[in-house]
Design a protein with these regions (language model features):
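Solvent-exposed soluble domains appended to multi-pass membrane proteins
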Residues: 1-234
Length: 234
C-alpha cells in the first residue's frame, strides 16, 4: 500500500479486505499515464492470499501471473511455495517466451519473492554458505536464506542487463517488511550477533539504472519510496 500508492496503513484491520475496491493512485497507473505501459504482477502466492487479485486490479495491474502459472520446483517453507531461484528462472523463461514484457512493450513489472519468510529453513542442497557454530541457529538460517534470495535476484538482474531494453529500465529492489520480526530482540542480545543483527527494523531500497545517481545513508521511511519513484519516472 505504501510503496505502490503512497498511503499509510489502517490503524486496525487490513485495507486489502476492507477497502480493496477503492480508487488508488498507484505507480502502475502513473506508468500507464506516462508511458502507456502494461502492468504485470508475478507472484507464487494464490490470488486469494491477502486478496491480492482484487487489490492488483484496483492498483491498475493488467496481468496477474500467480500460483498456478508456475511449476512447483524447489518447494520449501511453511506453505511449500517454490524457492526464489526457481521463481526468477521461470520469470526469465516467461520473458523469453513473450508471455510478459513482449517485444516493444513498455511495462511495469512487480516480482514478489517468498523465500525470506520464517522459519528460514533452506533445504541443504540449496545452501551455498555456512557459518561457525558460535552463530545462533536462527541468525545463521536467516543469513543463509537471505544469501540464497540475494543470489537469485542478482542472477535475474544479470539476465536483464543482457536485454536491449535494459538501458531504458529502472530496477527497484525493496522489502515490504523487515525479516527477523520477533527473533530480532533475542538475537540483538546475543554477543555472537554483535555487528550482524541491527536493533532497528530496516528494509532495503535499491534503485539500479536510475537516471539520478546517489547514495543516501540516513534513515527514510517506506512512505518516502512512492514519491521518490514517481520523481524518477519523469
Amino acid at each position: 500500500l505504501m510503496i505502490c500508492s503512497g498511503l499509510l496503513p489502517l490503524m486496525s484491520g487490513t485495507y486489502s479486505s476492507l477497502y480493496y475496491d477503492n480508487t488508488f493512485y498507484t505507480l502502475q497507473k502513473a506508468m500507464r499515464g506516462l508511458k502507456h505501459s502494461r502492468s504485470y504482477l508475478l507472484t507464487i502466492d494464490k490470488v486469494s492470499t491477502w486478496n491480492q487479485g482484487a487489490v492488483a486490479r484496483s492498483f491498475g495491474t493488467d496481468t496477474i501471473i500467480s500460483y498456478h502459472d508456475f511449476k512447483m520446483t524447489e518447494a520449501f517453507g511453511t506453505h511449500k511455495r517454490i524457492g526464489d531461484a526457481s521463481f526468477f528462472q521461470q520469470c526469465r523463461e516467461k520473458i523469453e517466451r513473450g508471455e510478459v514484457w513482449k517485444p516493444g512493450e513498455s511495462v511495469y513489472m512487480q516480482f514478489v519473492t517468498y523465500s525470506g519468510h520464517a522459519p528460514f529453513k533452506l533445504p541443504d542442497h540449496l545452501r551455498t554458505i555456512t557459518f561457525p557454530a558460535s552463530i545462533p541457529e536462527k541468525a545463521a538460517d536467516y543469513m543463509t536464506t537471505a544469501h540464497y534470495t540475494d543470489k537469485a535476484i542478482g542472477d535475474f538482474v544479470a539476465y536483464l542487463k543482457t536485454l536491449p531494453q535494459y538501458k531504458e529500465t529502472i530496477v527497484v529492489i525493496v522489502g515490504d517488511h523487515e525479516g527477523l520480526a520477533s527473533y530480532r530482540q533475542e538475537l540483538v542480545g546475543n554477543p555472537a550477533c554483535r555487528g550482524l543483527v541491527s536493533d532497528k527494523q530496516l528494509t532495503p531500497f535499491i534503485v539500479l539504472n536510475s537516471p539520478v545517481g546517489m547514495r543516501y545513508d540516513k534513515f527514510m521511511g517506506q512512505i518516502d519510496i512512492y514519491p521518490t519513484l514517481l520523481n524518477l519516472m519523469q
